[in-house]
Amino acid sequence: MSDTTEVPRQSSENDQDNNLERTNSLKSPDVTNNIPSLFKLAAEWQINNPQETFQNHILENDVLKKINEITHLIRESYKDLSSQDGMMSKQQQEKMDWDLFCTVPVNIIEQYTKDMDEIYEKMERLAKQQRLWCESAFQIDVERCGDSILNAETWMKKKERHLEYKNIEMERSANEIKETIQRLTDDR
Protein backbone atom coordinates (compact mmCIF):
# COMPACT_ATOMS: atom_id res chain seq x y z
CA MET A 1 0.00 0.00 0.00
CA SER A 2 1.37 3.42 -0.82
CA ASP A 3 1.94 6.02 1.86
CA THR A 4 -0.17 8.61 0.08
CA THR A 5 -3.90 8.74 0.52
CA GLU A 6 -6.10 9.42 -2.43
CA VAL A 7 -8.37 12.43 -2.33
CA PRO A 8 -12.00 11.40 -2.76
CA ARG A 9 -13.25 12.11 -6.22
CA GLN A 10 -15.78 14.91 -6.15
CA SER A 11 -18.04 15.25 -9.08
CA SER A 12 -19.49 18.54 -10.12
CA GLU A 13 -23.11 19.13 -11.14
CA ASN A 14 -22.04 19.34 -14.78
CA ASP A 15 -20.51 15.86 -14.56
CA GLN A 16 -23.70 14.54 -13.00
CA ASP A 17 -25.75 15.97 -15.88
CA ASN A 18 -23.45 14.27 -18.38
CA ASN A 19 -23.73 11.05 -16.44
CA LEU A 20 -27.52 11.31 -16.39
CA GLU A 21 -27.54 11.77 -20.14
CA ARG A 22 -25.47 8.63 -20.50
CA THR A 23 -27.78 6.74 -18.21
CA ASN A 24 -30.83 8.01 -20.11
CA SER A 25 -29.50 6.39 -23.21
CA LEU A 26 -29.33 3.11 -21.29
CA LYS A 27 -33.04 3.19 -20.47
CA SER A 28 -35.19 0.62 -22.04
CA PRO A 29 -38.09 2.08 -24.00
CA ASP A 30 -40.79 0.25 -22.04
CA VAL A 31 -39.91 1.87 -18.64
CA THR A 32 -41.58 5.18 -17.84
CA ASN A 33 -39.63 8.33 -16.88
CA ASN A 34 -41.27 8.59 -13.46
CA ILE A 35 -39.85 5.29 -12.12
CA PRO A 36 -36.04 5.23 -11.89
CA SER A 37 -34.66 2.30 -13.78
CA LEU A 38 -32.28 -0.18 -12.25
CA PHE A 39 -29.89 0.44 -15.10
CA LYS A 40 -29.87 4.14 -14.29
CA LEU A 41 -29.22 3.52 -10.57
CA ALA A 42 -26.49 1.02 -11.34
CA ALA A 43 -24.87 3.43 -13.78
CA GLU A 44 -25.02 6.27 -11.25
CA TRP A 45 -23.59 3.99 -8.60
CA GLN A 46 -20.67 2.95 -10.82
CA ILE A 47 -19.95 6.45 -12.13
CA ASN A 48 -20.20 8.37 -8.86
CA ASN A 49 -18.76 5.47 -6.86
CA PRO A 50 -20.20 6.60 -3.47
CA GLN A 51 -18.76 3.51 -1.78
CA GLU A 52 -15.23 4.76 -2.43
CA THR A 53 -16.21 8.25 -1.25
CA PHE A 54 -17.59 6.87 2.03
CA GLN A 55 -14.63 4.58 2.48
CA ASN A 56 -12.14 7.41 1.91
CA HIS A 57 -14.06 9.60 4.37
CA ILE A 58 -13.89 6.87 7.01
CA LEU A 59 -10.22 6.24 6.30
CA GLU A 60 -9.37 9.83 7.11
CA ASN A 61 -9.01 8.67 10.67
CA ASP A 62 -5.33 7.73 11.22
CA VAL A 63 -6.08 4.63 13.24
CA LEU A 64 -8.32 3.26 10.54
CA LYS A 65 -5.66 4.05 7.95
CA LYS A 66 -3.11 2.07 9.92
CA ILE A 67 -5.53 -0.84 10.30
CA ASN A 68 -6.16 -0.74 6.56
CA GLU A 69 -2.40 -0.78 5.90
CA ILE A 70 -1.94 -3.73 8.25
CA THR A 71 -4.77 -5.61 6.59
CA HIS A 72 -3.24 -4.94 3.18
CA LEU A 73 0.17 -6.16 4.40
CA ILE A 74 -1.39 -9.32 5.85
CA ARG A 75 -3.10 -10.04 2.55
CA GLU A 76 0.18 -9.51 0.69
CA SER A 77 1.99 -11.84 3.07
CA TYR A 78 -0.66 -14.53 2.53
CA LYS A 79 -0.17 -14.11 -1.20
CA ASP A 80 3.60 -14.46 -0.73
CA LEU A 81 3.13 -17.55 1.42
CA SER A 82 0.80 -19.17 -1.08
CA SER A 83 3.25 -18.52 -3.90
CA GLN A 84 6.18 -20.05 -1.97
CA ASP A 85 6.44 -23.30 -0.04
CA GLY A 86 5.04 -21.66 3.06
CA MET A 87 2.20 -22.58 5.34
CA MET A 88 -0.41 -21.54 2.83
CA SER A 89 1.08 -23.70 0.10
CA LYS A 90 -1.32 -25.81 -1.92
CA GLN A 91 1.24 -28.61 -2.02
CA GLN A 92 0.80 -31.44 0.40
CA GLN A 93 2.97 -30.97 3.46
CA GLU A 94 5.11 -33.79 4.80
CA LYS A 95 3.55 -35.72 7.64
CA MET A 96 4.84 -34.98 11.10
CA ASP A 97 7.02 -37.73 12.54
CA TRP A 98 5.63 -37.78 16.07
CA ASP A 99 8.01 -40.51 17.21
CA LEU A 100 10.96 -38.35 16.26
CA PHE A 101 9.22 -35.33 17.74
CA CYS A 102 8.90 -37.15 21.09
CA THR A 103 12.25 -38.96 21.14
CA VAL A 104 14.43 -35.95 20.36
CA PRO A 105 13.43 -34.00 23.51
CA VAL A 106 13.73 -37.18 25.60
CA ASN A 107 17.24 -37.77 24.23
CA ILE A 108 18.15 -34.15 24.91
CA ILE A 109 16.89 -34.42 28.50
CA GLU A 110 18.74 -37.72 29.03
CA GLN A 111 21.96 -36.26 27.64
CA TYR A 112 21.52 -33.17 29.82
CA THR A 113 20.94 -35.37 32.90
CA LYS A 114 23.99 -37.49 32.07
CA ASP A 115 26.17 -34.40 31.60
CA MET A 116 24.88 -32.89 34.84
CA ASP A 117 25.63 -36.15 36.71
CA GLU A 118 29.19 -36.14 35.35
CA ILE A 119 29.64 -32.52 36.34
CA TYR A 120 28.24 -33.26 39.80
CA GLU A 121 30.65 -36.20 40.22
CA LYS A 122 33.58 -33.99 39.18
CA MET A 123 32.46 -31.35 41.66
CA GLU A 124 32.24 -34.00 44.41
CA ARG A 125 35.77 -35.23 43.63
CA LEU A 126 37.09 -31.68 43.61
CA ALA A 127 35.28 -30.92 46.87
CA LYS A 128 36.78 -34.07 48.43
CA GLN A 129 40.25 -33.07 47.21
CA GLN A 130 39.71 -29.58 48.58
CA ARG A 131 38.65 -30.97 51.98
CA LEU A 132 41.75 -33.20 52.04
CA TRP A 133 43.94 -30.28 51.06
CA CYS A 134 42.35 -28.08 53.73
CA GLU A 135 42.83 -30.80 56.37
CA SER A 136 46.45 -31.36 55.37
CA ALA A 137 47.09 -27.60 55.30
CA PHE A 138 45.51 -27.36 58.75
CA GLN A 139 47.72 -30.22 60.01
CA ILE A 140 50.82 -28.53 58.57
CA ASP A 141 49.81 -25.24 60.19
CA VAL A 142 49.19 -27.00 63.52
CA GLU A 143 52.61 -28.67 63.35
CA ARG A 144 54.33 -25.40 62.44
CA CYS A 145 52.52 -23.60 65.21
CA GLY A 146 53.40 -26.39 67.67
CA ASP A 147 57.03 -26.23 66.58
CA SER A 148 57.04 -22.45 66.99
CA ILE A 149 55.53 -22.72 70.46
CA LEU A 150 57.98 -25.48 71.41
CA ASN A 151 60.91 -23.42 70.13
CA ALA A 152 59.67 -20.37 72.02
CA GLU A 153 59.21 -22.45 75.18
CA THR A 154 62.71 -23.92 74.82
CA TRP A 155 64.18 -20.48 74.25
CA MET A 156 62.38 -19.11 77.31
CA LYS A 157 63.62 -22.00 79.48
CA LYS A 158 67.18 -21.41 78.28
CA LYS A 159 66.76 -17.70 78.94
CA GLU A 160 65.48 -18.42 82.46
CA ARG A 161 68.45 -20.71 83.14
CA HIS A 162 70.79 -18.09 81.76
CA LEU A 163 69.19 -15.43 83.95
CA GLU A 164 69.42 -17.75 86.98
CA TYR A 165 73.08 -18.30 86.17
CA LYS A 166 73.61 -14.53 85.84
CA ASN A 167 71.78 -14.02 89.13
CA ILE A 168 73.98 -16.58 90.86
CA GLU A 169 77.09 -15.00 89.33
CA MET A 170 75.97 -11.54 90.42
CA GLU A 171 75.27 -12.74 93.95
CA ARG A 172 78.67 -14.39 94.11
CA SER A 173 80.32 -11.26 92.72
CA ALA A 174 78.38 -9.15 95.22
CA ASN A 175 79.44 -11.44 98.08
CA GLU A 176 83.08 -11.27 97.00
CA ILE A 177 82.89 -7.49 96.79
CA LYS A 178 81.24 -7.39 100.20
CA GLU A 179 83.86 -9.67 101.72
CA THR A 180 86.65 -7.69 100.10
CA ILE A 181 85.26 -4.42 101.45
CA GLN A 182 84.89 -5.94 104.89
CA ARG A 183 88.44 -7.24 104.92
CA LEU A 184 89.72 -3.89 103.84
CA THR A 185 87.77 -2.16 106.58
CA ASP A 186 88.90 -4.71 109.20
CA ASP A 187 92.56 -4.35 108.23
CA ARG A 188 92.56 -0.73 108.91
From Swiss-Prot:
Composition bias type Polar residues, residue spans: 1-13, 21-31
Inducing factors: Expression is induced in response to alpha factor and regulated by the UME6 transcription factor.
An individual GO BP term: homologous chromosome pairing at meiosis
Stretches for region Disordered: 1-31
A Gene Ontology cellular-component term: condensed nuclear chromosome
Keywords for the protein's UniProt record, in alphabetical order: Activator, Meiosis, Transcription, Transcription regulation
Functional summary from the UniProt entry: Probable transcriptional activator involved in meiotic prophase and synaptonemal complex (SC) assembly.
Protein name: Grand meiotic recombination cluster protein 2
